[in-house]
Amino acid sequence: MATKPQDANTTSREAITSKADSPPRPTALIFDSGVGGLSVYQEIRQLLPNLHYIYAFDNVAFPYGEKSGEFIVERVLEIVTAVQQSHPLAIVVIACNTASTVSLPALRERFAFPVVGVVPAIKPAVRLTRNGVVGLLATRATVHASYTLDLIARFATDCKIELLGSSELVEVAETKLHGGVVPLEVLKKILHPWLSMREPPDTIVLGCTHFPLLTEELAQVLPEGTRMVDSGAAIARRTAWLISSQENVISSQDENIAYCMALDEDTDALLPVLQSYGFPKLQKLPI
């Protein structure tokens, strides 16, 4: 029997469910520069398993940690607008700390649907620390963002905050999700400023959504008993509340889908990973 030719802008395997089997669901867009936002998506899906999920990642401009704020704002607006033209969005989650620190005001000004951002979990980390030293591990853009410095000034006046910015760690997380090995020596080199301290942080804020993907490896390198905190669960609760507060939300019977900005060998290799997260199809977003 003949099979339908596959669109050049789409990568997929046999659909997990058909539209007829899927109940109507509000549509949630989860966006990140890379695949780190899948850690946030996991938390949201645990609370809201019946939403229609779209995952979009900017593999053309990745990583955002080294980009200017102006570029990031324009890029995120362009991508969210393109997704909105094809899907009735009920909510957007910017699952990228770097993008959240600069793009939320512009997104909320342009769109009527709620937009949720990810910010470093400094406040809960301050409550958890035992030695009064909290480490913020993030991209350099997030570490130096005025929003981050404001959070520290508001919630961490009684603690010592050690800042460590690393884009290399983002690349390491991407490599792991693509099936690569995480060399512990690389992590030790990245974390050396903390590991060499007489009294290192006992609580670490994972200030990039890629970093929860590396918690097992980080735990092998950091001092025993170090706590790691991220914003995933809090973002999931906020998303659930905003969804439940909406009325007359347009629902979708479409299956979950992932969008990238360019299809290549790397995205082909990533498809099985995305399918394991519940995204049977990966498609190039027309922008």
From Swiss-Prot:
Residues 1-25 are annotated as: Disordered. Substrate binds at residues 32-33, 64-65, 97-98, 209-210. It catalyses: L-glutamate = D-glutamate. GO terms for molecular function: glutamate racemase activity. InterPro entries: Asp/Glu/hydantoin_racemase (IPR015942), Asp/Glu_race (IPR001920), Asp/Glu_racemase_AS_1 (IPR018187), Asp/Glu_racemase_AS_2 (IPR033134), Glu_race (IPR004391). It is an enzyme of class 5 (isomerase). Provides the (R)-glutamate required for cell wall biosynthesis. Keywords: Cell shape, Cell wall biogenesis/degradation, Isomerase, Peptidoglycan synthesis. Pathway: Cell wall biogenesis; peptidoglycan biosynthesis. The keyword Phosphoprotein does not apply. Residues 1-15 have a biased composition (Polar residues). This is Glutamate racemase.
